Amino acid sequence: RIGSLRTIQVVRSGMKVADVDVYEYIMKGKLTDDIRLSEGDVILVSPYENLVGISGKVKRPMIYEMKHGESLATLIGYTGGFTGDAYRNTVRLVRRSGREKQIYNVDQQDYDNFILTDNDEVSVEAVLGRFSNKVEIHGAVYRAGMYQLDSVTGTIKRLIQQAEGLRGDAFLNRALLRRERED
């Protein structure tokens, strides 16, 4: 946590011969800054610039070192991206500023432009556990359970047909319908 993986210099005979960013190798597999070391070379490891934590529904949640000017989109790229159950439209960020913390809800269209600073904490939530197109049928039907609500399953008659009809023990004089939404 003290030394940088992003700003490493190789000095030879008093002259800087290379700047090495280990993330280029670790995250992208690029060896663009690969240099052969010689006897007497000095390797200078700078202190880190910005450490940013990311937790929640990303593939590699942990603390990352970010260079000055790197965006939230870059951080998400370093994590390997979102998991399948991540809510991608907005992420929450906590930033320490002076004496207090500030919270930001960053929309997906702003990921490229939102610049991270030292000690930012990013949280990616999961999608909600509710359904937007679900109807359930229970009781004296052959296939009780959840069904997709769409133009095909738009009537109770069609729902009963999808549940493979009523069983012989069904009480045909009454049914109970419970609606959870006003629409």
Predicted regions and their residues:
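Ser/Thr/Pro/Gly-biased, low-complexity, turn-/loop-rich segments
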Residues: 1-183
